[in-house]
Amino acid sequence: MINSPRVCIQVQSVYIEAQSSPDDERYVFAYTVTIRNLGRAPVQLLGRYWLITNGHGRETEVQGEGVVGVQPRIAPGEEYQYTSGAVIETPLGTMQGHYEMIDENGDAFTIDIPVFRLAVPTLIH
């Protein structure tokens, strides 16, 4: 979890065995992000950047507008939650990134999302 003066980000990931195919080096993960506005004014998420790294160190960058097709506006004390997915070639990997946001005055700020793990559960003891 990371906190800024205005926003708290929490991420949980889960392995999707039914959509994965280890024999084909295809490991599917879902991740759920909760964005909480801890400030006294609304904020809006405009864009995202992800760096996805597989277990061999191969990096993939993903960036774009909004998340899951929307640019949510989050009122003070409220939260926005969404689930998305990532596919990597190894049973273990990581994701990290940032969100580009604006406050009620239109001032831009960036919220870093620290590294979190994508892992097949049987690998972690």
UniProtKB/Swiss-Prot annotation:
The name this protein goes by in its record: Protein ApaG
ApaG domain sequence ranges: 1-125
Lineage of origin: Bacteria, Pseudomonadati, Pseudomonadota, Gammaproteobacteria, Enterobacterales
Entry superkingdom: Bacteria
Role played: Not known; mutations in apaG/corD give a phenotype of low-level Co(2+) resistance. They also decrease Mg(2+) efflux but not influx via the CorA Mg(2+) transport system.
InterPro entries: ApaG_domain, ApaG_sf, Uncharacterised_ApaG
Example GO biological process: error-free translesion synthesis
Pfam families according to UniProt: DUF525 (PF04379)
